UniProtKB/Swiss-Prot annotation:
PROSITE patterns found in the cross-reference section: PRD_2
Pfam annotation, one family: PRD
Keywords: Repeat
PANTHER family: CRYPTIC BETA-GLUCOSIDE BGL OPERON ANTITERMINATOR, STATIONARY PHASE-INDUCIBLE PROTEIN CSIE-RELATED
Annotated organism of origin: Escherichia coli (strain K12)
Name of this chain's protein: Stationary phase-inducible protein CsiE
Superkingdom per UniProt: Bacteria
This protein's record includes keyword Repeat: yes
Amino acid sequence: MMPTLAPPSVLSAPQRRCQILLTLFQPGLTATMATFSELNGVDDDIASLDISETGREILRYHQLTLTTGYDGSYRVEGTVLNQRLCLFHWLRRGFRLCPSFITSQFTPALKSELKRRGIARNFYDDTNLQALVNLCSRRLQKRFESRDIHFLCLYLQYCLLQHHAGITPQFNPLQRRWAESCLEFQVAQEIGRHWQRRALQPVPPDEPLFMALLFSMLRVPDPLRDAHQRDRQLRQSIKRLVNHFRELGNVRFYDEQGLCDQLYTHLAQALNRSLFAIGIDNTLPEEFARLYPRLVRTTRAALAGFESEYGVHLSDEESGLVAVIFGAWLMQENDLHEKQIILLTGNDSEREAQIEQQLRELTLLPLNIKHMSVKAFLQTGAPRGAALIIAPYTMPLPLFSPPLIYTDLTLTTHQQEQIRKMLESA
């Protein structure tokens, strides 16, 4: 069979993948390679790459699998909860990347399926749904942007369709307690009662839990205004986290409240992700851990009590982002961004790498280490702004130079103390 040929697609790769994913969630449609090729205006080779990348993304971020049936059709497999959270993410992304697809294809398909199932129109009428969202807005004292209102109306229709089909997410005990403790749970129960009165049938107990999670994920944490009991508890937990980090690292922060506020905004969302197995970008940790090993280890140790309190284990990606926040605030306390350490290089890259790693282990603070060949250093001297020269090779000393420390392989205790003192001085 000859592959389908098509002119270059006008859509970007993220747009194509978003349309693929939303098509897979579109009710009443069997999607094959040909479906995606035609949808995105690409040939089969590009469509295949897009499908593979979409599969990798939903596996990484939502623990879902993209499978192929005997007829060549694709489907998303995994728990109902993970599938709903996946659609939450991609549908919101779709309103930015491919709004015309949502308007012209996803929405009509959803409404058509609701009608086909015989669900009363007043359940999914746009006016009624907007009134329900506005009621939630007033109860939560949160103003939804027009895009969020549009998203919620559409997403609630998808949940209604699943509810009617007897498909409901399952929560483990920890997830259940978390959802029940959030500000949005009372509003979610109200939505459940609304559906129950109109449908004259009981609402599964986990459905209001999901509605609470849905609305809580739309809320941007605000350390100055959030006043719910769980928000106050989180602020206290973060204070203990910062105290623990300060003790472990023997450091101080000039604006500890500012640090706590930033950690609150981040960790409020990180807890949601960790409790519900939502992944984040995994490109940071390996390189970051190599550059700032002591900062990463200290952050992980400081987080142990926080994780125990909430019954979670933050992934390396999540703890790496917390380390970035701590590192940024440590740099504000110091003048490290103005300093440079010059590591002289020659013909022994392994020795140089070991010495650089020792330097990075000396301090929590991010280091600005630049490499410069011995030959260039002897010819031109130290670069402007260099605060310290580390020389792994014997050589003639220049007449003028910043402080220079020679080490064969292992920094002595005295050298470590001197370097640390120099680096951590303001």
